[in-house]
């Protein structure tokens, strides 16, 4: 999620054509497909399938958490698609490919401590900590559009510091959210739990791409990121008031 945008921006800034950039994406997809094809799993005897129902595709107990995650992924979708244009719009001249480089570093750093805390059962606490950081980052990202009038060098430093913190925030929440969904599901629905987690994330990113582009078209990107920051606040309060109590009540492990 960080290496792809980073590589694409570096290639684009090096005057590489879009045909080559998308060809690289296609090659990466083919390599991923081959790697997935080579994965071997133990044979499992076919089991009788239950009638098709909603809970075969969506973990019903995970819907509250899915809503919270969806709200968080909307501004993330704005970031992965529009942060380069936003930086150009407000006047940041440094390569925005480094934004995703630092974001990837932040995600890697977060795994050094977040996984251990999740293993100790502090799932909701880890998610809330990540949410606080992400809320700050998106408000800060929006604020860059205003504070750049005072100092370009300081805004540039702040802009890239946000990317590092954003990587830490999302990197902290990703495994914790996945664990939260899985712990709400019986063993027979672990796949459904992961599917619900990923669907919520992907739908939010799609909404972020559409809504972020529309807001930027009628206004500016800094307003789009301000709207995204407000959504993270809604997600935080919803998680604190609904998702966390729901999880502690219905968790199975």
Describe each region flagged by the PLM.
Residues 62-69, 73-92, 99:
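Helix-loop boundary and gating motifs at the non-cytosolic
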Residues 12, 110-123, 216-217:
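Helix-to-loop junctions at the C-terminal end of transmembrane segments
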